[in-house]
């Protein structure tokens, strides 16, 4: 007789039955009950049970007595050498104070002897938790987990089950007399998960940043070059050659090719950059507004400017775009310095990796060039940008940057870390940077740069940047990430 029929027969005479009454495995019962309950023939509840059971070794001790008790029996007949006795047996015999050592011989101590271990095993259900754990350490007992099913009649209960019609066909469509035999639709079934390729959360956020920039009227810069000369990355930005960030502790220098020939840089522009950096007197070309800055008052080396590096910021691209803008206006009859540019790409810093820093990360950068721009317009633009990202808690802190003055650090509040974390830097590009390029004095360029990863951490509620980027993140994290991030 089948398990299904056994259940139906028992329920015909009893209102409720237990799976213990069925002489079969719970795994077999579970499948039958799922089938019957889907037809509403039976209802059932699962009661998890934890049992204390004897191991094979425990059953032997229950039957024949513990090793320490049997040791005492042997000692009653003759003395034994300590070398011939199991250490575990000795341990428990000494613990019970049944034996003692005399002249390297084990002898009885004279105390009353009772096989406590055997007694505990025979009363397994009533012993304390500590006593059970002690027996478990000796591998005499174990825990057995199982499910007990309490089964009752369902609304469609019938001892004689008719076959359910699972599908309609041209043969049975017009010949079904009892529609109750049609299998009901189950709208509560969990969906079948289908796994497709998923975009990394940073890729999605990058697309949203790009959309926001485009909405604000910005054009995207081409940032395909990871390797830059030190000239464009540092010198064109009026960053002194003895600045700490230009040392190997902060910057990745290339071994091959080690130097850049600077063929993409006009020699006269190199001279103007050298003049603004150096204390030496170098003639400035006619037609360029002269910068009266004292510079850095140090000797500028073109050899240092030729060193190839992995770019430390995308501002290296910004400086090239601004130089092209200035040069094109020098040749144009109608001047137009109004431009809004942005970039989102990787940069590299030789930093110690920790919860909020990586050696490789994405930099988001925006700049606006035009007349009558100042710190007020910069703050307004940054706040507008972050409002579109739905990050409203923004602070500014005065800072120093070699190529911007005034400069400000941008901080955003992290709800999970419950503290303000640095998002990026901002400022107004110095005349020492712009005038050698060919900009007139009345043109101002405001700019800001920030990490892509930091806002992503805030929106995803992550405390460690390595949970967002790296080999340890799970596929499920990527698959389950929201389609749109910045709308909440």
UniProtKB/Swiss-Prot annotation:
Its cofactor is Mg(2+). L-phenylalanine binds at residues 315, 363-365, 403, 429. Keywords: Aminoacyl-tRNA synthetase, ATP-binding, Cytoplasm, Ligase, Magnesium, Metal-binding, Nucleotide-binding, Protein biosynthesis. It is an enzyme of class 6 (ligase). SUPFAM superfamilies: Class II aaRS and biotin synthetases. One of its GO terms (cellular component) is cytosol. Residues 1-146 are annotated as: Contains the major tRNA-Phe binding sites. One of its GO terms (biological process) is phenylalanyl-tRNA aminoacylation. Its EC number is 6.1.1.20. The keyword Protein biosynthesis applies. One of its GO terms (molecular function) is magnesium ion binding. It catalyses: tRNA(Phe) + L-phenylalanine + ATP = L-phenylalanyl-tRNA(Phe) + AMP + diphosphate + H(+). Belongs to the class-II aminoacyl-tRNA synthetase family. Phe-tRNA synthetase alpha subunit type 2 subfamily. Tetramer of two alpha and two beta subunits. This is Probable phenylalanine--tRNA ligase alpha subunit. It comes from Enterocytozoon bieneusi (strain H348) (Microsporidian parasite).
